[in-house]
Amino acid sequence: MIIVTGGAGFIGSNIVKALNDIGYTDILVVDNLKDGTKFVNLVDLNIADYMDKEDFQVQIMSGEEFGEVEAVFHEGACSSTTEWDGKYMMDNNYQYSKELLHYCLEREIPFLYASSAATYGGRTSDFIESREYEKPLNVYGYSKFLFDEYVRQILPEANSQITGFRYFNVYGPREGHKGSMASVAFHLNTQLNNGESPKLFEGSENFKRDFIYVGDVAAVNLWFWQNGVSGIFNCGTGRAESFQAVADAALAFHKKGSIEYIPFPEKLKGRYQAFTQADLTNLRAAGYDKPFKTVAEGVAEYMAWLNRDA
């Protein structure tokens, strides 16, 4: 069995799909379906069982077994960068992750987990997986950073795989439930389909992010599991492309519309990553040599998926 926490969420459900694509269906999805709309992410996938996150946590804490577990992909977390309830964030992202990590270590189960580029904070260069480059801007980033620091202490003594991935700006299928936290590509598509002018912040040609297609993220996860490589790795393309490039790709697909530029919100000033670009030195040194989709390629594929029933 393979366990995917957050398996009904964005990245988790794409990992389930990638596992299905290589013939795995003995998958336990752990999630919180209080937001019932997330079920759509699993509707076309094959899994063996579903468990609520709180029930799962109780079983982990009591040391109950789940049979023979080949790997745990831990994608379950609060991923809202605008959530400021620190207690909730630390319980959900830090404490729960520690409990699950120790459960896996005791049983020598490979543990692959979601970290985040939010650990780097507001820097504009040197996105390198090392303490001196890390300074998160929000409590979400801090919760991810703190768990990475915890993992760093344990890695030298670990007898089984521990791998963390610092996801950069992920976009693609199965993110519709995320609301305001969904990618710019998702929102632009919605606006275009509603007959509205797609909106970007003023200066969007200067806001550059490392946009990575979710299919590439899932491929990275599976490769590291299949190759047993431990460590903390950036998971981006190594390229910074502008929000304008995302919009251009969306407009090219829809063949209509023009961008409406809106003022940058006061509440995001100083708390907004204006630039991200993954340093892939460690990822490539670990042996991962597959290419990553450009924004033009990935957004075109995503638009086709979003509009497949249109």
UniProtKB/Swiss-Prot annotation:
GO terms for molecular function: ADP-glyceromanno-heptose 6-epimerase activity; NADP binding. The active site is at Y140 (proton acceptor), K178 (proton acceptor). Its cofactor is NADP(+). NADP(+) binds at residues 10-11, 31-32, 38, 53, 75-79, 92, 144, 170, 178. Keywords: Carbohydrate metabolism, Isomerase, NADP. Pathway: Nucleotide-sugar biosynthesis; ADP-L-glycero-beta-D-manno-heptose biosynthesis; ADP-L-glycero-beta-D-manno-heptose from D-glycero-beta-D-manno-heptose 7-phosphate: step 4/4. Binds 1 NADP(+) per subunit. It catalyses: ADP-D-glycero-beta-D-manno-heptose = ADP-L-glycero-beta-D-manno-heptose. Its EC number is 5.1.3.20. Substrate binds at N169, S180, H187, F201, E202, G203, S204, R209, Y272. One of its GO terms (biological process) is carbohydrate metabolic process. Homopentamer. Contains a large N-terminal NADP-binding domain, and a smaller C-terminal substrate-binding domain. Catalyzes the interconversion between ADP-D-glycero-beta-D-manno-heptose and ADP-L-glycero-beta-D-manno-heptose via an epimerization at carbon 6 of the heptose. Belongs to the NAD(P)-dependent epimerase/dehydratase family. HldD subfamily. This is ADP-L-glycero-D-manno-heptose-6-epimerase. It comes from Cronobacter sakazakii (strain ATCC BAA-894). The lineage of its organism: Bacteria, Pseudomonadati, Pseudomonadota, Gammaproteobacteria, Enterobacterales.
